[in-house]
Amino acid sequence: MNIKLSDYFDYKRLLRFALPSIIMMIFTSIYCIVDGFFVSNYAGKTAFAAVNLIMPLLLVLGCVGFMFGTGGGALIAKTMGERKADKANEIFTLIITVSALCGVVLAVLGFFLLRPVAEFMGADGELLEQSIIYGRIILIALPFYILQFEFQCLFATAEKPKLGLYVTVASGVANMILDALLVGVIPLGVTGAAAATAISEFIGGVVPLVYFARKNDSRLRLVKFKFDVKALLKTCTNGSSEFMSNVSMSIVSMLYNMQLMKYAGADGVAAYGVLMYVSMIFQAIFIGFAVGTAPIVGFNFGAQNTAELKGLLSKSLRIIGVCAVFMFAAGELFASPLGKLFVGYDDELLEMTVHAFSIFSFSFLFSGFSIYGSSFFTALNDGLTSAMISFLRTLVFQLAAVLLFPLIWELDGIWLSIVGAEVMSITATVLFLIGKRKRYGY
């Protein structure tokens, strides 16, 4: 049975509606993880470090799609809640068009930024050259990567989360098969890994574009539109928190890599890469749930259904709490097997990775609440509050921690800084939720 945004959502229905978005985010994370697995095990730790070194810049450029998807999705859902279907389709078409054009411009810009950014982070020799090779191939598919991120959010708004899941699974499976072929069978190293990812991103961006360009049974389709500056600015404002979050995380990742090069060398960067890969899967569950439930929040906000808003918030926080405990336990129990999956060929690097993960796992107890809190305010069209939560969580607290903690605990301080930043961010999120309660009636 197809679930409508106007339905009443109990725990079962809420999870059913959000599940496709959760799986979508997991499969999106698999792109990077599969690359990392094959590159590390078949091309060696220098190639693995090269991918990890340049990845933050690529994520900064790609997260424009997440900004348009979450920000536009919130505005579209609110517009549908106000019973303005034609206007919703015009906004939908506007943001798809603008984001695709942004992708082309950013791809050209990124092409020239790759080398100076890699050199700034301390890369040289083979590490530098492999970073640039990987980055330039990925940039060819950047417009499709942006569209893929965007459609992952908008499929839920169109009340077609399962269709979004099928597209993401198809592109994810394509990535895995191509990685096995181009890195495992044909030893093309970072070139093969980048080509596999670029092709899968093309699939993930083009298939939804074709679907929405034709007549379909969803609530959204591409139509003729007038350039609406106000709607575009509102979209960017709503999605600024998600954009800022991804940009900040990428900037912080660069700083982590610089600190790790200082305290542990290339092995430290490789260990951090393993943490980030595993974290992508765990965080994808929180992000997927937040993205999947955001259209429901936005619709009920537009319909002024405060009773449903209260129920959605309380149920969501309970679900996140249960997931957080399970993720922490899984992180502690499977630190060693997960480490062996990526760096089992190097005992010293494996030992460092397992130790780091046993500390890092504590962050899972707190991160989901801040991720959901930011998304919740985006869905309420309160982009400023959402951006503040993201800015504090992903930039201010992380920067402060990663600069100060190593002065006290050296290498362990770098791993502890992630946990410390999440504790500070959940405190800020709770304060914002309490402070805005009367204004939004939740």
Language-model segments: what does each one mean?
Residues 1-18, 76-141, 185-240, 297-363, ...:
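Short alpha-helical transmembrane segments in multi-pass integral membrane proteins
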Residues 48-108, 145-163, 271-335, 367-389:
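Small-residue-rich hydrophobic transmembrane alpha-helices
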Residues 69, 138-156, 167-175, 193-206, ...:
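Short runs within selected transmembrane alpha-helices of multi-pass transporters and secretion channels
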Residues 36, 45-48, 85, 114, ...:
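Membrane-helix interface/capping residues of multi-pass secondary transporters
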Residues 6-43, 56-71, 75, 100-107, ...:
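N-terminal transmembrane alpha-helices
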Residues 30-48, 118-125, 181-188, 250-277, ...:
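Helix-terminus/linker motif at the lipid-water interface of multi-pass membrane proteins
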Residues 23, 27, 31, 61-65, ...:
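Residue-level hotspots within pore-lining transmembrane alpha-helices
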Residues 16-35, 137, 171, 200-204, ...:
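Transmembrane helical elements of multi-pass membrane transporters/channels
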